[in-house]
């Protein structure tokens, strides 16, 4: 009888240890892209390269009217608190003004994921706003600085 209890205790302890190791691995693998101090395309590219994150510049155009230009950087299949998503970083006049998490599964808790991720896309002294976009099968979440977003829309309204 004592042998059976001892055997079950050993199995329980091994299972508990494996579970703790799994939780530690799962939390460490949830490393997010953090943009504190990285607000220009060049500094974001350097940051992504240092972290061995594969990215591509998907749009680089200088608008001849006025003094504005847009650059977007895309990071595909990146693990976040919202699951594995694509991330689109949008710059206006070399300042990061918008970050979009794309193709978030309907299975995710959107309020938790959106508020948890918001911290990583804002400056240390202020919080970014966010908007959840429901496409039926999946979600996108936009994070943005209200002042910069208004400046972008004002520029677009003036020159379009």
Curated annotation (Swiss-Prot):
It comes from the Bacteria. This is Uncharacterized protein YdcD. It comes from Escherichia coli (strain K12). The lineage of its organism: Bacteria, Pseudomonadati, Pseudomonadota, Gammaproteobacteria, Enterobacterales. The gene is ydcD.
């Amino acid at each position: 009888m004592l042998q059976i209890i001892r055997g079950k205790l050993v199995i329980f302890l091994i299972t508990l240890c494996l579970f703790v190791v799994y939780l530690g691995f799962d939390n460490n693998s949830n490393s997010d892209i953090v943009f504190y101090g990285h607000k220009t395309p060049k500094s974001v590219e350097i940051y992504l390269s240092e972290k061995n994150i594969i990215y591509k510049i998907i749009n680089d155009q200088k608008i001849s009217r006025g003094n504005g230009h847009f650059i977007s950087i895309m990071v595909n299949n990146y693990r976040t608190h919202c699951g594995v998503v694509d991330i689109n970083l949008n710059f206006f006049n070399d300042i990061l003004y918008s970050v979009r998490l794309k193709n978030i599964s309907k299975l995710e808790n959107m309020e938790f994921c959106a508020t948890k991720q918001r911290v990583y896309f804002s400056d240390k002294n202020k919080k970014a706003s966010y908007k959840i976009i429901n496409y039926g099968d999946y979600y996108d979440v936009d994070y943005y600085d209200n002042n910069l977003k208004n400046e972008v829309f004002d520029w677009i309204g003036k020159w379009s």
